[in-house]
Amino acid sequence: MKSTNISRSFSKIKKEKRIALMPFLMAGDPDLETTAKILLELQANGADMIELGIPYSDPLADGPIIQLAASRALSAGTSPDRVFKMLFELRDQLKIPIILFTYSNPLINKGLEEFCWQASKVGVSGLVVPDLPLEEAEKLSDIAESKEIDLVLLVAPTTPKDRMKKIAATSNGFTYLVSVTGVTGERSSLEDNVGSLVQQLKDSSSSPIAVGFGISDVKHIEQVREWGADGAIVGSALVKRIANASIEMKVEEAGSFCKELRAATN
């Protein structure tokens, strides 16, 4: 596998005999100034990589918690350009990989080349586009790779086995294994078949595997680790904690939750 910021991070974490903690944060919820502080707080409290959502008005893969966060961020005037500006200002302070989570529409509106160029300029290491089918991934993957950005592809429990192998072989940085059928959101338990899917992916690709959608507490992180995955992505649970905290406590709440989750990674 090609050496990139993300692959080097996974290699380092593997040597430490633990899994990667990969929190998801919606950019601009409640505002970009707070997002910037939370990014640094997550880094300080053990996040290995951060998935940063670009808000979009029709987020098909997301459940109500992240949909509401996107809506609040859009109401606050968040746009891809403003997210890039914030990341540029943080570039010297952020030492861990930042992975942008964006739907196809904002990418197409800006132009694939322009989006990837701006992302690389501000230090972005990866890109996740949940509504991008495998058949349309090659062009974006090539553009992203030329800017040293990994295009990460998603595999779901309903993905046929042959297609799963193709996705894992095409995905760069890691393969994003969706742990549930349906949209993002907190779950009380994870689906039993995810462990066997992790093994299937391990058998067909050397790419690291990160499990996301529904990962919301220490118990889930431990489960993901037991399955043999390489990383756990925690989204809705963190977004909810930030939303429920007072404006003065949002940054601290994000940091303390991250610290709690990080302790379960080894």
Swiss-Prot record:
Record keywords, A-Z: Amino-acid biosynthesis, Aromatic amino acid biosynthesis, Lyase, Tryptophan biosynthesis
Listed name of the protein: Tryptophan synthase alpha chain
Amino-acid biosynthesis keyword on record: yes
Chain's gene name: trpA
Family: Belongs to the TrpA family.
Superkingdom classification of source: Bacteria
GO MF assignments: tryptophan synthase activity
Cysteine disulfide links: none
Job description of the protein: The alpha subunit is responsible for the aldol cleavage of indoleglycerol phosphate to indole and glyceraldehyde 3-phosphate.
InterPro entries per UniProt: Aldolase_TIM, RibuloseP-bd_barrel, Trp_synthase_alpha_AS, Trp_synthase_suA
Organism ancestry: Bacteria, Bacillati, Cyanobacteriota, Cyanophyceae, Synechococcales
Keyword Amino-acid biosynthesis listed: yes
Protein EC: 4.2.1.20
Species per Swiss-Prot/TrEMBL record: Prochlorococcus marinus (strain NATL1A)
Catalytic activity reported: (1S,2R)-1-C-(indol-3-yl)glycerol 3-phosphate + L-serine = D-glyceraldehyde 3-phosphate + L-tryptophan + H2O
Pathway assignment: Amino-acid biosynthesis; L-tryptophan biosynthesis; L-tryptophan from chorismate: step 5/5
Active site, UniProt feature: E51, D62
Subunit note: Tetramer of two alpha and two beta chains.
Gene Ontology cellular-component annotations: cytosol
